[in-house]
């Protein structure tokens, strides 16, 4: 039994046999290749030498794939830091939009269309209800993030929305509801359900949907109509978490949700010739952690379910936080509220400086003597050094 193994190790052992027996999309195949070859030299190397002692360092490049567990931390820190300048010292709420599990097969067969429909339904629900004078009567700002997994890597598409708890009315006056969320959850539920189902029906009527695997029965009109009736009869359950405790907690929370993938390396507990054991939360037991063992190929199947379609944008900004509005309107909100501007810490810093600040590691210093390291020209031919020469 292998302990201290990584997702890369799991892919090396089980992906080749999985690929030979399963249908895999180009995006999934590309993600698998990137994960297996990240930091192996397949994506090139950076070679540097110490000016003082001559010690040579070879750094293998990462794949930078958004599904790779080894490539998320640095982009996450940069993205979250850039969002500092958009954050107000005002109430924020975390709203989660989910759909009935009966829709999962048809969503998985039509990811690009039906993931996009999730954004449309969630954003239209929040914007339209917030603009209604019965609730707040303002233009609000929020960020929507798509996650497609549950704790066991099951298929569970849902939207996380980080919502500003106030906004600007038609006269550009600030309005909020204090620490209480300004929209009733039941109203959100009914509105979101209506909007998502309307777009799903429109896609079906326009013959835009595909029906693969367990979604095949829904190609029949009567079976599809029965699915719609089942989903309409259900109570869709979005939920709102308690407000954030200040702007810094919003920034930390964004880091928790934005660049997450289906499972991280620390949750992989062990691997055998045939199985993988990982930890997951058991929500039937108040979210307590438990260990789950599944076959290696089943692990690969579950992981690849969460590779997004090519060029699909998972993080989207709306209202006051949209790229069209935020420069003027967030500045206006900040002036009205009299709150300070949170300045980006990493703006205009190069990679070595960011690494030094975040991880207290100076990659420009030799690990042997502390001397200055310089990079060798990329076009220079380089002979692989002997092991004793490597730092």
Describe each model-derived feature in a short phrase.
Residues 1-391:
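Beta->alpha loop/short-helix hinge microenvironment recognizer with preference
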